[in-house]
Amino acid sequence: MINQENNDLYDLNEALKVENLTLNDYEEICKRLKRKPNRTELGMFGVMWSEHCCYRNSKPLLSKFPTEGKHVLVGPGENAGVIDVGNNQKLVFKIESHNHPSAIEPFQGAATGVGGILRDIFTMGARPIAVLNSLRFGNLDKSSNVDLLRGVVSGIAHYGNCVGVPTVGGEIDFDDSYSGNPLVNVMALGLLETEEIVCSGAKNVGSPVLYVGNTTGRDGVGGASFASSELTTTSLDDRPAVQVGDPFIEKSLIEACLDAFKTGDVIAAQDMGAAGLTCSSAEMAANGKLGISIDLDLVPSREDDMSSYQYLLSESQERMLFVVKEEKINDLIEKFSKWGLYASVVGEVIGTNEVIISHKGKIVAKIPTSALSDDTPVNFHNVINNPPDDLLKKWEWKENDLPEIHEKNIFSLKENKNFSFSEIILKLLSNPSIASKRWIYKQYDSQVQSNTVFTPGKSDAAVIRLREQNKKNKSKVFSGVAASVDCNSRWVALDPFRGSIAAVAESARNVSCVGAEPVAITNNLNFSSPENEIGYWQLSSSCNGIAEACKALETPVTGGNVSLYNESKNKDNLITPINPTPVIGMVGKLDNVEKAISSEWKNIEDQIWLIGSHKSETKIAASSYLEYFHGEITGRPPKIDLLDEKFCQSFLRNAILKSLVVSSHDISDGGLAIALAESCILSERGATIELEKDLNRVDNLLFAEGGSRIIFTISKMKQNEWFNYLQLNQIKFPSSVYVKKIGYVSSDTLKIKIDEKNICNIRVEELTEKFNNSISDYF
């Protein structure tokens, strides 16, 4: 008999609103249970049937992704993906979002986002070795956005620094669409330390279920449902739905869990993240095709008089649920106690496929595991056949809509005056989306663990040194991994399909630019409401683009996160959706980390080369230049030829491994001119560049984006070897791929000539001042 705890008298309409469920959902719940749910059970269904937990709106689209590959050991379905990076080493990685919590409580929202993704990693038996983040905020001319940025960065820094995991890289972008709804996506990587991957499926009927970690409180109750709804002017009232983290307990939890896993006494493990004890128990039961019974009276709590609803939906941080060997339970409890952690047997594995919850001596919930985890509802939406009319109109934009170029100047449609190309370069460098993120990453400890090869900002991707390998020559050789998070949300907003292909291609290109082979991705799909036909079309088109790019580049998807309903409602009830933002977290492997290279020029007189594709379009449409200089967000983003993209990356990687290429940098936001300026700034050296205009406008040549392009340098000492390599590989080149010398590294000035005419002459000091101070000036 199910105890209704006197809450069978609840107001149904009010309860459904709180749990973000529909009347149809309620009728389906009654059908599954063959009775009416009590209030506790309704809360359990509310969180488990939310988009955050069951992907009810996105599941049909996620099935399009390739999930298998030669390096993939664990794909979607577990706490994180796992790949083989060679030398008997396994990399665990995943990305997650904490968007809505960060919007109303930026410090704790971001901090617990870091804590949550770290638990996904070490729950698999891996030691966390790196964190990256992808952040989006509204423009910094609004003080509220400055406050959000300050709070989020402080939260990430606090948790990551205290727990001892380096924050090694990331990206950040600013756009008005994020003003009411910032995005905080965190990616973590870990190196497996156990002989076997620790999985989440419960096994062996009668095995004890062990609760480990922090105590349970009322913080975070309903967090999963909160994360699956839009933000409104009353969202600040939902602050109790934001969790409060303790990185020092997390540090103890990491060490204690890895120690316990190595004993082989832990049969299964699941962290308590979204939906807390409800989700962890249901997923462990479902993944093991068994059931679990939990007695809430045995759960360590920090507050008195908590209801079963609060116990089950609390998202208090730093908590884990284990299935363990019965004969080893005392040893494990003693081990966790030594780390200052609570450890208590709270239940057992049962033979029936149910989650059974007891409280105060009575059963308060009894639900089939399939109803909570395996067989959750799916919302099917119609996909509109054609892009929206406003996008089609933007796609008609042509470069000849811009003012003509007179000598060395062009008229800005945004500021109604002429600018020289040197002034435009400086202006673009001061755009916060392009400018140095030094103010942000200097708050992070990027060097803890002593395996970070390049500090943030020095290279296109983060590079982490792995364990030493024993080679026959007895010299120390370290393998490594590279990671990058990328998305040009402006491109995705203007064409979700092309923009998402570009996000995958750029993340792979960044990994290739350090010399690593891209092998797999995790993604974080940040979109607005799927109930809006344009919002769902954006999501569907984006998934199609990601799937196509991942198949072509052979980088399967190992898992990730979907965050929908990212839109804000103002006091007039007007809804502002975010730019669709499918963040791609790419990982790559290096056999020898000493071969990795950065983006900075190395030596004066090194040759500067450019590789790219004629099939991959290069144009001003959808560019940063068009937005920031002319005030227009329009045009169709460049199309990327994925075969040429793959060839360009492979060709460059091979040259890097042969130690022919000494620096490389992909061309993205701001085009060729900004890529050149960035390498000058990083190295405190100049560059002398000579280009041919052909039929291009000068601004197209300097600021166009796309083209699968990379600039790289060849040491003046290796030029003969380079030309030999180039000649040997020429026969393999597709006719649409080009490699050409465009200049050389010089002392202290960026000089650009086009058709032998001086277009730009800027001292590196001036470039650096604009680049470094743009964001910090707001603080």
From Swiss-Prot:
Signal peptide: none annotated. Pfam families: AIRS, AIRS_C, FGAR-AT_linker. GO terms for cellular component: cytoplasm. Mg(2+) 2 binds at D120, D271. InterPro entries: PRibForGlyAmidine_synth_PurL, PurL_linker, PurM-like_C_dom, PurM-like_C_sf, PurM-like_N, PurM-like_N_sf. Monomer. Part of the FGAM synthase complex composed of 1 PurL, 1 PurQ and 2 PurS subunits. This is Phosphoribosylformylglycinamidine synthase subunit PurL. The gene is purL.
